[in-house]
Amino acid sequence: ITWVTGVQTCALPICSLAFSGSLLCLIWGLIEANRIGWDTSLTTLRLLAGVLLMVLFVVVQRLQLRPMVDLQLFKHPRFVGALLGMFAYAGCAQVMMTLLPFYLQNGLGFTAIASGLGMLPFALTMLTFPKIGTRLSRLLSPASMMALGLTLVGCGNLLSAWAVSMGGYLSFACAIAVTGAGAGLLNGDTQKNIMACVPRDRAGMASGMSTTMRFSAIMLAIGVFGALLASHSQQALTRSLQLNAPGWLAQTDHIVSRVVAGDMVAAMQPLTENARLIVQPLAQQAFVSGFSTVLWVAGLMALLGALLVGTLMRNPIPAVQLSAA
């Protein structure tokens, strides 16, 4: 690290460690909070460490002559809207490619291969709708395109939540096709809109911020949605076991941890044959209840993102102003 007149000119290792450490502590705290409790000192310490490391990252960036991230960009609503669009797309659409197969396995009893095939409606619309988006972009503004894509994602997730609560594959397939359509519309536009907000000589920084936002959103979404799924599934299973099989309440944590991971067989191993006949349907119902909650939250977040992004991105592009500066 080099210091010149009290100003840090090269702090890439510190910035990288601070940002990575912040994400690590936040995700760690979110995931473990459901196991050890949200009111424990360890959970508070992890989340607080994540916030402090993020503050350190911002402070170090502001002290540099040539910062890795130009924080002045965040003064422009359109740039903030473009980043929020990427965050919402990754956190509410892309992450579903990881989470939805768990429902096919645990909720509908599909094999791993059948679950992969069951995701085809999502994949097909995600692959075909970028071409439709190219044509729509001639008629709609970037703000409208982003809002439309996120609205489709939100509606698809809400329809998926309804389909999960109803049961059956056909309605679920139609719902995830809507989510895939929204993801397809957003796939090319998200990074393009971010790049359009910065001068050409800062294109590398914009590309890095776009990629960082994408993967940060995916990691945080998996942590948050995973914690939400585990928490609601555990609550639902505890209530069911208290009514139907109180003798197996001690196995609740083990059963939920394995079911949420997609391994129903391992979840049932500690139980006797007779107990499995009672507990397995209860575990399946608890998982479905928790998964439906996750989809409701993801759907509402995507719709909120559509509103915010559609509003913020109607502001003028700041690239010309930044170039002049």
What are these model-predicted stretches?
Residues 66-72, 237-241, 317-325:
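Short, Lys/Arg-enriched, Gly/Pro-containing loop segments at transmembrane-helix junctions
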